[in-house]
Amino acid sequence: MNKPPVTTALLDRGRDRFGIFCSPCHGAGGDGNGIIVQRGMPRPTSYHDERLRTADDQHFFDVISNGYGAMYSHAARVPPRDRWAIVAYIRALQLSRHASIDDVPPEQRAKLSEAR
């Protein structure tokens, strides 16, 4: 399956699937501080590390599909479209952490200022 376009629906699905399949290890914010770490398992790499922020989308899809290190394959549990949804959500997490106000369109900046 080719990578689908990123839509709100895809991001919503990605957030849901991330919460089920990824956050127990990677944590809700993708920092690598999921519940498994609290139980003594090794900490997975943070999605906010430079190496993963600069990795291409296919890397994340492949890791979900095939596993990596201590992470097992999720291919039997997560269909391809959901894998792409998770990838899109990981990118949203990364952007949310590393964005500046200049990345926000001017009309949205005004709304953010009003909300404060």
Predicted regions and their residues:
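Flexible coil segments in periplasmic/lumen-exposed cytochrome c-class electron-transfer proteins
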Residues: M1, T8, G19, A28-D31, ...
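Membrane-embedded segments
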Residues: R15, G19-P24
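Long, soluble amphipathic alpha-helical coiled-coil "stalk/rod" segments that act as peripheral stators
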Residues: F60-V63
